[in-house]
Amino acid sequence: MSNKLNKQISTEISECYLKEKPQQSFKKSNEIKMSNELINKISNEISNCYLKEKPQQAKKETKKKSIRSLPTDLPPLKSITPLKSWIFLQCRQMDANGNPLCCGVSGRYTQPGTQCILWQIDENDPSQLWQISKDGHLVSLLAGNYVMDYNNDGTNLAIANGWNNYTSQIWTYNSSTGQIENSNYPNTCLGIKGAFNEPITPTNGTELVIDQPIDNNNLCFQWDLVPSYPLNTILTSPPQAFPTFPGDQNTAFIEISQYLSNVDDIRSQYTNLSVSLPFFQSQMSAMSYPSYLSHEEFDFVRDQLSTEFNYAQEIINLIGNYESFHNELFADNSARLNQLATLCQLEIGSDINAMGSVIQVFSGMMYSILEALPGVGPILGNVLQTAVNIGVAASDGHSTIQPDPFQVALSNLWDTLSTNYEALLSNVSNMETMLLQDWGMMVTTHGLIETLSGPNSLAWQSSMTGDLISAAVPGYEISLLQILMPSKYQIYRYDLANNGNVGLPDDIPSSCLWTDPNDSNITYFIADNETTKVYPDDSLMSLIWGNGVSEQEFFLSANGWNFCMSLLNDNIGSGAPTISNNTSTALNFKIQFSPTQIYNYDVPTHSSNFTTEFDNTAIENSYYQITIYDNTNSWVASISVRVDIFVMRGADVSVLSSSCADGYYLGTPNCLQGSFAHSFTGSINIPIFEN
């Protein structure tokens, strides 16, 4: 509250107290309790003043108190394992105006060998978002299997390159020094070209190299991962008790506690959301000195508690801002999901299966926010991602977020999603409790709330919430559509040079059609799973394109899309498989139709690949084996597939068995029957996720 309001409230409290107890002085704690009538009166006056001064904040706090309470007696967190997430690589050396610059790919080109450069944090620039793979590759969001490397022509320029297993592409982030170290040359790290002797001031377009700086304190070779998720460290730090008060200070502490809330320990009220810490602050400011305590001792305790009240209220406001964001986005009782299902021509109450991943929903939403609001988006990420990390590891069912992919009927989809949304909010409340009950955590968090910018900032102002919601909605809607659309639609591939005399439908809407820019003979279109004559509405496709999805990632199932791919030709007896790699690790798969008919395909990071081959020996039913490997040729998964061929009907594809290595999740395969009447093959999509 403002100083003016504090003074006004203090005066009102003093006047009210004098009217009620004009002759009473502070002697013993049991003699200073105000009547319930007076407490209610003062509370009402404070509330009225508070509403006039901070109407939006007061409204938010009232809502908080009415819908939730904080848990207590939580066990300490020993560790938090961060999940894979998209981040900025932000150089600690600022430009001449004190603005941060991030590592990106020059021109946003996807050609191997493109220079990595520094550039101001830019909206909607996927080349500035990176993900660290399990083995240390720095994977770009710009394209699958597009990773950071360096040029071995003697220039040592940092480049974006195609994935390989050379150590030049393996990096380690040293959190102690802030250096991104290269595994190929010891003691070398990513930095600004020409700055190994001493720091220089970078500009947009400054080239990056790997080099060995003379001074490890050189900011040109130091980086922050943004968001940095500082709450992971704070919440796992050793417990630190609040300062103790000896002798008369403890007497003063009890005196104040009794006066404010009729308890012996006012700190027990920090997690009680039904009380107002600003009200306590103003009450405490108005207290007269007890006659039996020195002013110095009393002021010492009052000053310490005043600091604690301020720090605690900052944390409550931070979590309250997240809660407002969360409720606006997720607590709509399935309204947004129902609207999108209607756009997809799906009945949300039907028993049609939907498949997806809650982690993918959160991830898609988060990188949408980072792209749209690179300045303030990381503040939300610093809160949300830690809560997700805690939820995935939680053993308490109420707080557990489901990490593995799910398959549910559409009628149960909202229940599945909302259970995880509630678990996310529960973990945020748990975080709030832990921060409010530990002095060390409270002090550190206060410092980050006061830090207005930077990778560790938690300075979430209430005015930011609307922008964060607006930035989150596109990513959230796309994530929901990635779950819904494969239940109704698949991608069809038409090859003009190899079509078996089957023609391309002539009524495909332009919004549902895409020609491969690298091969004009290849056309992709989206249509109903059962017929090539039913297409998504233009309103649905406009929503997808309007939310920034590229045609290439949509029609080739990249960045969270997991469509089946059917081949449009007269070979209707085949069952075309698509492998969707939803991980930051490069994969490949082998498909074996027979001992002599074996094919191998790469599956880039966050991308899909498929085969146009089929069993050329099959007359009736056929079987094939799919084996998936990682980039080191280690086994990841195996799937046995059966293709049943029916006269005058399309091939029916099914999975006989499957298995998966530790560290990965195999999603439920989506199996679709082909069509004799419409001349398309059976199809299957097999999604794979990281554990």
Curated annotation (Swiss-Prot):
Pfam family, one: Ricin_B_lectin
Keyword Acetylation: no
Entry-linked InterPro entries: Ca_Up-reg_Membrane_Reg, Ricin_B-like_lectins, Ricin_B_lectin
GO biological process: response to cation stress
Every Ricin B-type lectin domain range: 47-174
Alphabetical keyword list: Lectin
GO CC, alphabetical: cytoplasm; nucleus
SMART domains in the cross-refs: RICIN
Taxonomy, superkingdom: Eukaryota
PROSITE patterns: RICIN_B_LECTIN
GO MF annotation: an example: carbohydrate binding
Family stated for the protein in its record: Belongs to the cup family.
Protein name (record): Putative calcium up-regulated protein I
Encoding gene per record: cupI
